[in-house]
From Swiss-Prot:
Keyword Metal-binding in record: yes
Motif ('KMSKS' region): 602-606
Name recorded for this polypeptide: Isoleucine--tRNA ligase
Binding site for L-isoleucyl-5'-AMP: 561
Gene3D superfamilies: 1.10.730.20, HUPs (3.40.50.620), Valyl/Leucyl/Isoleucyl-tRNA synthetase, editing domain (3.90.740.10)
Length: 938
């Protein structure tokens, strides 16, 4: 028997079947770095329209976690897809380098500033620590396949950036948004510092819930208000609170002007309560026998005075819109030094902003004899005992409620009034302008808009001062006596900024005021405060984007971070940009959800359900991680587990196998010489290119809308359904058995070439390593890297006017599916071994029959059978299978007649008819020794 294997065009490629990504990717990365791939892309894109995705800086502390990976991969997918869409999209990664977490790390190792080290040496240690953290994180980000200017990232501790942060503050001061005040701010007693809104987390805490009676100073005035004369015992206004420790700072009781308040007689005293809450209060304090004596509106009680239960002074009843009927008594204990609402109403009524608590969370000397020096969280029981002793406690119980805690220490925080610097939301219309700017931004997903709007509408003034060592100095001088800013503040800040640009922030602490103030130095003091670290990152639109040459003065198009950044970076950036320039710093804001495990639980080291990106890359490769990110709908929580990553690896194999099939069958194809013109191609091949064209339209639209899971789904459908289970199956016969240089084969290779050119580009933003690998095996002249080009423009399809148009082939796909079902059943019944052992008769109604007949002898190639005939639907025998999908089709199967050709494996009756090639069929003889078979349709 002759060996006809050498006459076949078997697939061949050096592109490996297995990805071995964990082993291969580092080598590719080394090549990207050696070649300066990022620089090559920048040169290729020079002069194109820009798209700037501004990197929100991660904090330079600790290893990257899975959330970091999601964030950087999403950014990279966008930047690369924008590049392929014809944009110049530079990406400059950044890091947030100042602030408390770094200070705490350095303190752990070296002690607090001023102990073993001077403050200057401490700052140098912080700078050193941050730099090592940046290096560690940078390696991991690069390993993810993220392309950017890693050699020149921006760091908020770069001297120039530090100087520009000071300049940003100067601009805000110049625009009139800064003011000083003793306002209550979130205060962590462990950090001994004010906290930003975004540094506060909420946890359940158990606190005493108490009802306290404040006795009326003028009992007769109250009786007159309620129009009653007989009251048994003293009259009190009752407040309810879960923070007894704040009572020493009480300066008023807030009531609602429009609520009804009633005077209620209970045993031996009368109490004033909101009418709607009487029942719940009586139940709570265990009173069943009570009488309502009279009713008034809250407004009637304004400025009546009540005695503080133990502080020895009296306080007014005041009117406030923040009073609700959700819980309590309808009268709210008001301590302007311990709460933002209390502070605002206190300002309105000119109340003292009392702050009896020191930075360490203990009461200051002179507060109250039994409280001085006591930690506020240990004081609740002392205060409750005091109230009991004074006869003012109506009720106490333990209550679990959500309480603000420090994000770093996880310990409860307090509101504490301290002298601080604030960016005012309203004195120059910052709130109103910010709300207006929000409307001009595209928020993705769109619920982000309502979220940030409500935050901006309700937020207090922004406390931007911190009492820390490692941070950008506020660089202000205030008058010793008046505490007013120096009249030349803006000029002086610029002078400081110039020095910081040369020597870093230490220049401020080394500065002798005389150097820039001259004779005035004796009248002014340097403000020791540093800026809130959120001011550092929030001003990068000015300190980085406005000054980096690659951005050429263009504003950022997009900010992209986790959904917690509405109150973090998106907010601080919006505030600073609007305060500086009157406009938002971004055009689009995209947020992604948090990562959770396969059961939807939050990632936690204590549960042991964290997924380390480093482990995933070392085991499966970065492309698998990238594919998981892209295939997950990032608008909600993003589930990740070993099982989920395994599914991503399965999808990856499908895509890789498709790419490998294309490359293997392009063996020996030179696009410059072998390309077949569209009009001369086999119809099915043109259909396949048209499928790629339709897929490309969907994929590009999805990239444009940032719907990457749609990109992956469409890519998978193309590889698995349109190519894998239909086209690539059908063409194997023609590809392998036709004459090597025949139009039949070259037509097929032309289609595969166009498809491969398109596919490699669709993959590139997501499967960057694999796309680069595929690119290296594609035939024809090309640039060195897929990332420097644009989407493939060589695709074409079938015209709707053609008889065998897309609709024709869509129907053929269905027919093929129905025939496959019958073949599978026959295989299960052991009637045939494989589909080529079968011959089928398709009993079809006239319209479908005409389409099937049009394919002539080539119908069998579409169906992958050795024989295929078409007959009238009404002539179908009883054993023909009725199609479930196509009502006008029945399929009958029989064993193919004739012998199996050892070359093409088809069963045919002309095997051995040609003496010189006695073992093979007539079609194969033509392909081996004759002019080759002609194919028109399939």
């Amino acid at each position: 028997m002759s060996d006809y294997k050498s006459t076949l065009n078997l697939p061949e490629t050096g592109f490996p079947m297995r990805g071995d990504l964990a082993k291969r990717e580092p080598g590719m990365l080394a090549r990207w770095t050696d070649d300066d791939l990022y620089g090559i892309i920048r040169a290729a894109k020079k002069g194109k329209k820009t798209f700037i995705l501004h990197d929100g800086p991660p904090y330079a502390n600790g290893s990257i976690h899975i959330g970091h990976s999601v964030n950087k991969i999403l950014k990279d997918i966008i930047v690369k897809s924008k590049g392929l869409s014809g944009y110049d999209s530079p990406y400059v990664p950044g890091w947030d380098c100042h602030g408390l977490p770094i200070e705490l790390k350095v303190e752990q190792e070296y002690g607090k500033p001023g102990e073993k080290f001077t403050a200057a040496e401490f700052r140098a240690k912080c700078r050193e620590y941050a730099a090592t953290q940046v290096d560690g994180q940078r390696k991991d980000f690069i390993r993810l396949g993220v392309l950017g200017d890693w050699s020149h990232p921006y760091l908020t501790m770069d001297f120039k950036t530090e100087a520009n942060i000071i300049r940003a503050l100067g601009k805000i001061i110049g625009n009139g948004h800064l003011h000083k005040g003793a306002k209550p701010v979130h205060w962590c007693v462990d950090c001994r510092s004010a906290l930003a809104e975004a540094e506060v987390e909420y946890y359940d805490k158990t606190s005493p819930s108490i009802d306290v009676a404040f006795q009326a100073v003028d009992q007769d005035a109250l009786k007159a208000k309620f129009a009653v004369s007989n009251v048994n015992g003293p009259i009190s206004l009752v407040i309810w609170t879960t923070t007894p420790w704040t009572l020493p700072a009480n300066r008023a009781i807030s009531i609602a002007p429009d609520f009804d308040y009633v005077l209620v007689q209970i045993d031996g005293q009368a109490v004033i309560l909101a009418k709607d809450l009487v029942e719940s209060v009586m139940q709570r304090i265990g009173v069943t026998d009570y009488t309502i004596l009279g009713t008034v509106k809250g407004a009637e009680l304004e400025l009546l005075r009540f005695t503080h239960p133990f502080m020895g002074f009296d306080v007014p009843a005041i009117l406030g819109d923040h009073v609700t009927l959700d819980a309590g008594t309808g009268a709210v204990h008001t301590a302007p030094g311990h709460g933002p609402d209390d502070y605002v109403i206190g300002q309105k009524y000119g109340l003292e902003t009392a702050n009896p608590v020191g930075p360490d969370g203990t009461y200051l000397p002179g507060t109250y004899p039994t409280l001085d020096g006591v930690n506020v969280f240990k004081a609740n029981d002392i205060v409750v005992a005091l109230l009991q002793e004074k006869g003012a406690l109506l009720h106490v119980e333990k209550m679990q409620h959500s309480y603000p805690c420090c994000w770093r220490h996880k310990t409860p925080i307090i509101f504490r009034a301290t002298p601080q610097w604030f960016v005012s939301m309203d004195q120059k219309g910052l709130r109103a302008q910010s709300l207006k700017e929000i409307k001009g931004v595209q928020w993705i997903p769109d619920w982000g808009q309502a979220r940030i709007e409500s935050m901006v509408a309700n937020r207090p003034d922004w406390c931007i001062s911190r009492q820390r060592t490692w941070g950008v100095p506020m660089s202000l001088f205030v008058h010793k006596d008046t505490e007013e800013l120096h009249p030349r503040t803006l000029e002086l800040m610029e002078e400081v900024a110039k020095r910081v640009e040369v020597d870093g922030i230490q220049a401020w602490w080394d500065l002798d005021a005389k150097e820039i103030l001259g004779d005035e130095a004796d009248q002014y003091v340097k403000v020791p405060d540093t800026l809130d670290v959120w001011f550092d990152s929030g001003s990068t639109h000015s300190s980085v984007v406005d000054v980096r040459p690659e951005f050429a003065g263009h504003a950022a198009d997009m900010y992209l971070e986790g959904s917690d950044q509405h109150r973090g970076w998106f907010m601080s950036s919006l505030m600073i940009s609007t305060a500086m320039k009157g406009k938002a710093p971004y055009r689009q804001v995209l947020t992604h959800g948090f990562t959770v495990d396969g059961q939807g639980r939050k990632m936690s080291k204590s549960i042991g359900n964290t997924v380390s990106p480093q482990d995933v890359m070392n085991k499966l490769g970065a492309d698998i991680l990238r594919l998981w990110v892209a295939s997950t709908d990032y608008t909600g929580e993003m589930a990740v587990s070993d099982e989920i990553l395994k599914r991503a690896a399965d999808s990856y194999r499908r895509i890789r196998n498709t790419a490998r099939f294309l490359l293997a069958n392009l063996n020996g194809f030179d696009p410059a010489k072998d390309m077949v013109k569209p009009e001369e191609m086999v119809v099915l091949d043109r259909w396949a290119v048209g499928c790629a064209k339709a897929a490309q339209e969907d994929i590009l639209k999805a990239y444009e809308a940032y719907d990457f899971h749609e990109v992956v789904q469409r890519l998978m459908r193309f590889c698995s359904v349109e190519m894998g289970s239909f086209y690539l199956d059908i063409i194997k016969d023609r590809q392998y058995t036709a004459k090597a240089d025949s139009v039949a084969r070259r037509s097929c290779q032309t289609a595969l070439y166009h498809i491969a050119e398109a596919l490699v580009r669709w993959m590139a933003p997501i499967l960057s390593f694999t796309a680069d690998e595929v690119w290296g095996y594609l035939p024809g002249e090309r640039e060195k890297y897929v990332f420097t080009g644009e989407w493939y423009e060589g695709l074409f399809g079938l015209a709707d006017s053609e008889a065998m148009n897309d609709a024709f082939w869509d129907e053929l796909l269905k027919v093929r599916g129905e025939v496959n079902k019958v073949i599978e059943q026959a295989r299960a019944d052991k009637k045939v071994g494989g589909s080529l052992e079968a011959a089928v008769t398709l009993y079809a109604e006239p319209e479908l029959a005409a389409k099937l007949t049009a394919l002539g002898d080539e119908l069998r190639f579409v169906l992958l059978t050795s024989g295929a005939t078409v007959a009238d639907y009404n002539d179908a025998p009883a054993d023909a299978q009725q199609s479930e999908v196509l009502k006008g089709l029945k399929v009958a199967l029989s064993k193919a007649e004739g012998e199996k050709c050892p070359r093409c494996w088809h069963y045919t009756q002309d095997v051995g008819k040609v003496a010189e090639h006695a073992e093979i069929c007539g079609r194969c003889v033509s392909n081996v020794a004759g002019d080759g078979e002609k194919r028109k349709f399939a």
